[in-house]
């Protein structure tokens, strides 16, 4: 089964605005770059992932993605996340991919074993595999097979909406709860938790150690 990983990326200098009270703009930019690099390194050379597709309107993010061997789609204007993901999925479908894995670039603890766990649950389509955030409100990873089976509905409360869409489509629903997939960096308390786990300081933007 061929799976493409789609990684949506906000402009590196604008992402993580809710951390503005904790990190400076330069520190947030550096953090966003490190998180993207970690995500790309985690996905690279995984036999379960045929191709990585990064979608962004930030030339710097797209250039970094290409340095890691990823394909890129540059957004025109300022489309909503769900619209950008739909366009990226169409690109993946042109290459006859069977499934797509949407993976935001703000999961500092994600490992290759996490990716394998998601793909393992995607056997025998039609299937939708969802990894919720630690509050079980948002969607931190979404694997859809076949690609295009359900509409994207990211945003506050997206976990339940994606579950509902999977059931409405008659797909098997698989929910994967893993601590490393549940923690995304959105709020100051998320950053504090990661720094505490890794024994780092705020001035040292975190990237999880690569796991083979």
Predicted regions mapped to residue ranges:
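Short, glycine-/small-residue-rich phosphate/pyrophosphate-handling segment
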Residues: 124, 144-166
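Short aromatic-hydrophobic micro-motifs that form the base-stacking/packing surface
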Residues: 101-103
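Short phosphate-binding loop-to-helix
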Residues: 64-99, 179
């Amino acid at each position: 089964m061929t799976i493409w990983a789609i990684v949506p990326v906000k402009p590196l200098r604008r992402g993580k605005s809710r951390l503005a009270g904790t990190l400076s703009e330069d520190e947030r930019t550096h953090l966003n770059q490190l998180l993207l690099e970690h995500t790309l390194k985690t996905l690279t050379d995984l036999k379960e992932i045929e191709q990585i597709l990064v979608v962004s309107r930030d030339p710097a993010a797209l250039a970094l993605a290409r340095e890691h061997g990823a394909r890129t789609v540059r957004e025109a204007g300022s489309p909503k996340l769900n619209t950008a993901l739909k366009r990226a999925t169409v690109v993946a479908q042109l290459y006859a991919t069977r499934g797509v894995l949407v993976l935001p670039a703000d999961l500092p603890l994600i490992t290759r074993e996490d990716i394998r766990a998601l793909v393992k649950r995607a056997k025998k389509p039609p299937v939708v595999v969802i990894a919720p955030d630690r509050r079980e409100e948002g969607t931190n990873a979404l694997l859809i097979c076949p690609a295009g089976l359900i509409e994207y509905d990211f945003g506050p409360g997206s976990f339940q909406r994606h579950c509902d869409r999977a059931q409405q489509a008659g797909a098997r629903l698989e929910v994967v709860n893993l601590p490393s997939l549940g923690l995304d960096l959105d709020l100051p308390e998320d950053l504090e938790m990661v720094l505490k786990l890794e024994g780092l300081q705020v001035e040292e933007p975190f990237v999880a150690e690569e796991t083979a």
